[in-house]
Every structure is written in structure tokens, then in C-alpha cells.
Amino acid sequence: MADEMASNEAALHRLDRTLTWQGFRELLPISLFVIVFGAAFGLAATQAGLSDASIVIMSTLVFAGAAQFASLELWGPHIPLFTLVLTVFAINARHLLMGATLYPWLQSLQPAKRYGVMLVVSDANWAMAMQAFSQGRPGLGLLLGGGIALWSFWVLGTWLGLYFGNVVSDPASLGLDMVMGCFLLAMVVGGEKNLRMLVIWAVAAGASLLAYRYLPENSHVVVGAIAGGLVGLFWGSRDHEY
């Protein structure tokens, strides 16, 4: 029995080419919608005065749609660097929570591989990976392969936006902004349901609501992510100690 449990646990930590390719294929449908938003970003960045090369490089290295759109609002001859960094951090603070929830499965990887996987983590592949883990299936392939799919189509969409962005200048007008929200809601409903996840999300939600009420604007995203992330990190560490 112990050997079987150890074998099942080891399977959850698997990350190989087969699982990565499977993850790529599973995230392919949602990745196609990412092209539209990438094209919208390419157009918006062009209108903001960025060069074609810098636009594609930004999408390639940053891979953070909402943060990239927000950075365009601050773009100009004199870029307020501190404000830009703070804005990007606030928008992406949810990755602290994602990293905390993934910690139990990522910690067995070598550091280079672990951080390589985290470079392509976004909402969609994180949600699918967490659902897989909750069902006793390997999820790291979904995380890496799905992330590569999303990243590839984001960069491709950005490049297409340089030339054809006017066709999809406003994805929200076509209702496409609801696609990712509906996808994530479906993942949450079918995702992991245990005390650890309940406490993490409850703490994150409570801290975020308090910050929204009493702290400066937009700080609730950072506060909620840090609070939930710390709970997830501490709980994950305690589980592996015993």
C-alpha cells in the first residue's frame, strides 16, 4: 500500500515531453482566443508609439496581457518607472497565490526547471493544472505545455496586430472578453475542493475585501494575493514536514 501511494505521488510530479505535448494540445482551443487579444495589444502598442520590434519583444519576455495594456497608459517621453513597476506588480500579484498553490508539486523539480515552468504560468493553464492535481492526475505537463501554447499564440497575436489589428481593435465588443472568465469559472467549479484550498481562497478573499475597504485603490489585489499566498506556502511546507 505504501509503495502504491508513493508511486501515485511520484506520478503527480511527472514532467516529460509526452505530458508537455498533451498539455499543449489541451490548451490549444483557449489559446486561439488569445490571438485576438494579442492582436489588440499589438495595435494599441503601435498607436502608443512603440516600435514593431519592441512590441514583439515585450510580449515575448513579459507575457502578461493586462499588465502590458496597463503599461501603455503610462508610456510616453518620460516614463514614470516606479509607477510602472508598481502597476505591473499590482496587476500580477495574483501570481503569488498561484505559486503558493503550486508549491507542493513544483518543489520536487530542479530550480531551473521549476522557474522555467513558472515563466509561462497564466490563469488558464494554472486552473487546468490545479484541476488535474485535484483529480489525482499529473498537472505539470498542463502547466508547461499549456503555458507554451498560450505564450506562443500571445506572441503570434501581437505580431499579427501590427498589421491587422484594426480588425479586432475591441475584443470586448464581440463578447470575447468573457471567454477567459467563463473558462476559469468552469475550472473553479470542477477544481480541487478540500480544506487547504478553502482556507487559501477564504483568506485571500477576506484580506482583499478589507484592503478594498480601508487601503488605497487597487491595493486589494496585492494584499489578497500575498495573504492567500502565505497561507498556501505555509500549509504546503507543513504538509511536507510531517
Please annotate each region the language model reported:
Residues 1-23, 236-242:
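Intrinsically disordered, low-complexity non-transmembrane regions of multi-pass membrane transporters
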Residues 12, 85-173, 177:
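Helix-loop-helix junctions within the multi-pass membrane cores of secondary transporters/permeases
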Residues 20-32, 57:
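Residue-level signal for short hydrophobic patches within transmembrane helices
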Residues 28-41, 62-63:
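The first (N-terminal) embedded transmembrane alpha-helix
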Residues 47-48, 53-54, 58-93, 167:
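Membrane-interfacial helix-loop connectors
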Residues 63-67, 90-97, 183-187, 208-210, ...:
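Alpha-helical transmembrane segments and their membrane-interface exit regions
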Residues 97-106, 128-134, 186-193, 231-242:
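C-terminal ends of transmembrane helices
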Residues 137-223, 234:
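Membrane-embedded alpha-helical modules
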